[in-house]
């Protein structure tokens, strides 16, 4: 599905930008702890952005419906990486409670891909 290629490319692009911003713009503004949080958000955004690209590419070539997988990965990025970016910038710790929602969305998305693959 074209939408997942677009979302994947945009997320990979944003991960490069947020990674550079973290390394150069936040270096002396955040503690090592919160820089690490920022880096984790960037890393997971990149991994799952690449996952979205893969979902977009395989969606037209397989008999399994991968649309749910794509949406779960996308919203996983929003909740997981998004909450970590906000946490790093604001240092409001309660925001970290949102992060596991994104993690669960990632896990369920990948699991659905595995299950769908076995059904082929």
UniProtKB/Swiss-Prot annotation:
It is found in: Cell membrane. One of its GO terms (cellular component) is plasma membrane. Belongs to the UPF0382 family. It is a multi-pass membrane protein. InterPro entries: DUF423. Keywords: Cell membrane, Membrane, Transmembrane, Transmembrane helix. This is UPF0382 membrane protein SSP2132. The chain crosses the membrane at residues 3-23, 46-66, 69-89, 94-114. Pfam families: DUF423. Its main location: membrane.
